[in-house]
């Protein structure tokens, strides 16, 4: 379970969800445990004690002394930035002493490898990206389930991977397929993780305060791929496409692309428009030796100039999730499921069934022919750009919060195109206002989200949307993005009552 180490001493840094899961997993396998957190009494400490986990707890600043006493592995929680000075010093000391630094994902990968010696060989699908991870992960899990597989969905989406694995072992119900949502934080410490297929949905600015630079952030996303992992890549995103192997490279991993245009390579996915109808399609090489075989067996890129036809899968309008960005997410999920040779028919039925996730471009009410849309999970600029372009209607946008050091310039074009006005809230409202001034769109700052909702409602016209897509984190005003969504929904409910409507 721990490479070539037998019951090692493990130092767990950070007692959040992943840190607690690492502690549980290590205790389960007889490891000696030391747990450290910068907080003297982190919320999960009570759970640790209640579960009877035998561990030394150290609260307060991190330092190299935490490695004393024979620590062999450091288990690093994903919320802790390795650039933070005290943690950076500790990790440098660990490196000097030959102490391994693993995150939960690496513990999980090592556990699957150990279970493999007993014959357990599940398929593993992984999803990352700045935006769309949770939707695509949930949808991929549903697709695999509808194809008759026993599925476990875990990771950044919750539950923690190690908790889900422990429960499956205890229930003697190990899944056929693991579908994992993975953040850049989780991937930063990946070493041996090698899923069967993995998707990068998009890469735009986010978490620059944690990674230090955009290049470092993008590189962390790329750690989702093992040497033989089938790569599912968004061809509309040039940063993502940097992870495509060079054409004709020896031993190159299989690559499948998806996008919102027509695919031009055998086995790729995209959209094709005919008589005003957008179709989800798969590119089929008419000259392939067996067009009925799964893509993974008939793909032969660069073998010749392909004669491509587009096989219609379903109308994009048949998806219950709104927006072109969600059509892209659906294509990515379908590509992942097909990459492990699941049959197409049940996958297409599942695509029509999926209703989406809360707080992700979710229409929560229509009042006086104005849609009120909750995209509180839109915590970065890329998410808000996708929401505006995906809705593709006149919108009064509510944005603002903690910008995390982002550049707001990518908002200029979609705001100029789609927004009737922008209501601004939170710490970085002035920075967003300054960036968007060139659009000529009315920009109004408000002290509260409730005030912004009522002002937006007064400006919206029939056929418009009032969209909460903050492009920012929430912690400057709210407990989390879900709390922000709750406040938005309550304000919309109040508005509906005032207007005598049913939200």
Swiss-Prot record:
Highest taxon of source: Bacteria
Family matches, as InterPro entries: Mur-like_cat_sf, Mur_ligase_C, Mur_ligase_C_dom_sf, Mur_ligase_cen, MurD
GO biological process, one term: cell division
Pfam families: Mur_ligase_C, Mur_ligase_M, MurD-like_N
Enzyme Commission code: 6.3.2.9
Residues binding ATP: 129-135
Keyword terms, alphabetized: ATP-binding, Cell cycle, Cell division, Cell shape, Cell wall biogenesis/degradation, Cytoplasm, Ligase, Nucleotide-binding, Peptidoglycan synthesis
GO molecular function: ATP binding; UDP-N-acetylmuramoylalanine-D-glutamate ligase activity
Annotated catalysed reactions: UDP-N-acetyl-alpha-D-muramoyl-L-alanine + D-glutamate + ATP = UDP-N-acetyl-alpha-D-muramoyl-L-alanyl-D-glutamate + ADP + phosphate + H(+)
One Gene Ontology cellular component: cytoplasm
Pathway of action: Cell wall biogenesis; peptidoglycan biosynthesis
Cross-referenced Gene3D superfamilies: Mur ligase, C-terminal domain, Mur-like, catalytic domain, NAD(P)-binding Rossmann-like Domain
Subcellular location: Cytoplasm
The keyword Transport appears for this protein: no
Protein family membership: Belongs to the MurCDEF family.
Functional summary from the UniProt entry: Cell wall formation. Catalyzes the addition of glutamate to the nucleotide precursor UDP-N-acetylmuramoyl-L-alanine (UMA).
Name of the featured protein: UDP-N-acetylmuramoylalanine--D-glutamate ligase
Gene behind this protein: murD
């Amino acid at each position: 379970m721990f490479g070539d180490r037998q019951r090692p001493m493990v130092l767990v840094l950070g007692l959040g969800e992943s840190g607690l899961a690492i502690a549980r997993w290590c205790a389960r396998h007889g490891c000696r445990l030391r747990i450290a957190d910068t907080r003297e009494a982190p919320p999960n400490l009570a759970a640790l004690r209640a579960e009877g986990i035998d561990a030394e707890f150290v609260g307060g600043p991190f330092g190299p002394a935490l490695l004393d006493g024979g620590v062999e592995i450091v288990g690093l929680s994903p919320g802790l930035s390795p650039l933070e000075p005290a943690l950076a010093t500790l990790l440098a000391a660990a490196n000097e002493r030959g102490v391994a630094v693993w995150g939960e994902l690496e513990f999980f990968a090592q556990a699957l490898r150990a279970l493999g010696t007993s014959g357990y060989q599940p398929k593993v699908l992984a999803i990352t990206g700045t935006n769309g991870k949770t939707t695509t992960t949930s949808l991929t899990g549903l697709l695999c389930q509808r194809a008759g597989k026993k599925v476990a969905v875990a990771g950044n989406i919750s539950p923690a991977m190690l908790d889900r694995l422990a429960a499956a072992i205890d229930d003697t119900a190990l899944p056929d397929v693991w579908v994992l949502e993975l953040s850049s934080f989780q991937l930063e410490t990946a070493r041996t993780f090698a899923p069967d297929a993995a998707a990068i949905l998009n890469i735009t600015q986010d978490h620059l305060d944690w990674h230090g630079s955009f290049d470092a952030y993008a590189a962390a996303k790329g750690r989702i791929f093992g040497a033989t992992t089938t790569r599912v890549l968004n061809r509309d995103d040039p940063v993502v496409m940097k992870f495509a192997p060079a054409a004709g490279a020896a031993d190159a991993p299989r690559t499948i692309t998806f996008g919102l245009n027509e695919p031009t390579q055998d086995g790729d996915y995209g959209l094709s428009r005919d008589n005003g109808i957008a179709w989800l399609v798969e590119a089929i090489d008419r000259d392939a030796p067996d067009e009925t075989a799964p893509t993974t067996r008939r793909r032969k890129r660069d073998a010749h100039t392909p004669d491509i036809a587009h096989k219609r899968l379903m109308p994009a309008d048949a998806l219950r999730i709104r927006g072109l960005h969600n059509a892209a997410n659906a294509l990515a999920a379908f590509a992942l499921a097909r990459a492990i040779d699941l049959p197409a028919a049940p996958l297409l039925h599942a695509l029509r069934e999926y209703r989406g996730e809360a707080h992700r471009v979710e229409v929560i009410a229509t009042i006086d022919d104005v849609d009120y849309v909750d995209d509180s999970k839109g915590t970065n600029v890329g998410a808000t750009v996708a929401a505006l372009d995906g809705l593709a209607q006149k919108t009064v946008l509510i944005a603002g919060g903690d910008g995390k050091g982002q550049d707001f310039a990518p908002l200029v074009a979609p705001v100029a195109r789609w927004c009737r006005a922008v209501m601004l809230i939170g710490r970085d409202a002035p920075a967003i206002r300054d960036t968007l001034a060139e659009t000529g769109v009315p920009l109004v700052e408000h002290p509260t989200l409730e005030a912004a909702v009522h002002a937006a409602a007064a400006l919206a016209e029939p056929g418009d949307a009032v969209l909460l897509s903050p492009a920012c984190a929430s912690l400057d005003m709210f407990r989390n993005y879900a709390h922000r969504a709750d406040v938005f929904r309550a304000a919309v409910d109040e508005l509906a009552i005032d207007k005598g409507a049913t939200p």
